[in-house]
Amino acid sequence: MNQENPPPYPGPGPTAPYPPYPPQPMGPGPMGGPYPPPQGYPYQGYPQYGWQGGPQEPPKTTVYVVEDQRRDELGPSTCLTACWTALCCCCLWDMLT
């Protein structure tokens, strides 16, 4: 392959990216153009509150979360947790010193 002589391009060749635009009529368009009239748009009023035409939301349901079991009592699991914590702290202290 040569930089100065590339292989031929298969196909009809490049074309313009877009067709030319049709001529536009002069003067303002059917609605008076893209700009508002000099006196502004007429007042439409405030929007309605409440029903806006879309689907209504279902009523909200209150959900109460209740603990299954309180763990205020001192039992074997609390003692075991404290022992494991102390053992880990002792091992960590031993490694650091």
UniProtKB/Swiss-Prot annotation:
Spans annotated as Disordered: 1-61
InterPro entries given in the database record: CYSTM1-like
Compositionally biased intervals (Pro residues): 1-40
Chief site of localization: membrane
Keywords, sorted A to Z: Membrane, Transmembrane, Transmembrane helix
Membrane-related topology note: Single-pass membrane protein
One annotated Gene Ontology cellular component of this protein: plasma membrane
Keyword Transmembrane in record: yes
Membrane-traversing stretches: 74-91
Annotated compartments: Membrane
Family: Belongs to the CYSTM1 family.
Stated name of the protein: Cysteine-rich and transmembrane domain-containing protein 1
Organism: Homo sapiens
Gene: CYSTM1
